[in-house]
Amino acid sequence: MSIDRAAARQAVRASGERWLRTRADALHLQRGRRLARVLDLDVMTGRAGDARVRSRTLVLARDPRHPAAPAAACPPVPGERGILEDGTLWWWAPADPVLPGLTLTGDPDALAALLGTAPGRARLTWRGYRPRDRAVLAVEATGDDGVVARTFLKVLPPARAARVARRMAAAGAAGVPVPAVLAAPKHGVLALASVPGLPWRALLAGPEAAALDPARVAALLDLLPPVPEEPPGPAGTTAGAAGGADADAHADAGGPAVLLEHATWAAVVLDPEAQDEAAARADRLRAALAAGDPGPRVPVHGDLHPGNLHVDAAGERITGVLDADDLGMGHRVDDWAVLIAHLEAGAVDLGAGGAALRAVAARFRHHARTEVDEVALAARVALVLAALAAQPTAPRAVRSARRAAADAALARVGL
């Protein structure tokens, strides 16, 4: 089940616009079998003689498990947001019904007040957007002295933003190099300072990839503070850590089980002909997860992939940690699994040129085995690889290679 162009055209007509050209079209497959489609369009507004062409972003969202979306889930706004007859939600960004803070992007005065600058001195660049989940924008603001300062706005559902701010404050107080929160969250908007360095992911194709000692990552994880009053948040798109379970009895199986369900469903959406293969892999992963010991519950990051680790130019020293949104109590094996799986996926994506990165992944895997159960680690690495193989942006050949890597991860420990 997907969201086709016909639904998009209905939404454009319902908004009173005229569709001229498609500049980008992206499918999002989200936890809970939710779908979203984001289209960057050129549209014509107004009638002949008073018409103007502008670029806008249209979002369509559907939850197949609850097709009859109530109006409360997407309060209609004439010309900006509504619900189609089949229950598909639509809106023009930034009118996301779950992220009210996105309206800040169209209000120069409110943005200036948040950043402490004069109106009109801030330039916004969208860095990422998951409909009904979160958005990240980079802001370059020019001060009275002419100096340009870069900050980031993370836009979340308001209740979640308050929790994330508390988690980040706890992490910072414990010495974890997370971005500083520059102001109390308002309407779900967190203003965050930059962190030094560059994403480790940017170095993975070069010799600097081998410079980071796994012991430095272990030391970073040891700094993570317990946040007992805060259950882990919904894990990131590929995180294997706790997936938002509210009770310990469910947390051990809840996170991996949720990710497995998502990866299996998404694999079938993207490659329907591989349905039997996906079901067999899910059974194998389920058995592997049951065979390993995840270890004690400890503070976890929740989405520790190479893009969330900043390092110095040499790649030797960790200088920053991003997306501590999911900080909470979980299993250390999950943080290691997310990191190692991304390294292995990167090596697979590089093909014949991935030998050096495969060696880096092997080194991290060897270190992780000194801290956590190797069967639990292999099962979770394979699970995250299966999830990475179900990303809509990955070409078919890449999806197939990542699935093969998931199978190989299990085979290494005889699973």
Task: Please describe what each predicted stretch is.
Residues 106-126, 229-240, 246-301, 369-373:
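An alpha-helical support segment within catalytic cores of ATP-dependent transferases
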Residues 152-157, 202-211, 265-275:
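Acyl-group handling in specialized metabolite and lipid biosynthesis
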Residues 335-369, 382-400:
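Active-site activation/catalytic loop segments of kinase-like enzymes and analogous catalytic loops
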Residues 156-159, 294-296, 324-330, 343-356:
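Short, contiguous acidic/charged loop-to-helix segments that flank catalytic cores in large enzymes
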Residues 36, 135-139, 190, 287-334:
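Active-site acidic catalytic loop and adjacent metal/ATP-binding pocket
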Residues 195:
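Residues forming the ATP-binding cleft of Hanks-type serine/threonine protein kinase domains
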Residues 1-188, 192, 200-201, 211-236, ...:
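Phosphate/pyrophosphate-binding loops and the adjoining catalytic core of nucleotide-dependent enzymes
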Residues 1-2, 237-251, 316, 411-415:
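Actinobacteria-biased recognition of intrinsically disordered, low-complexity terminal regions
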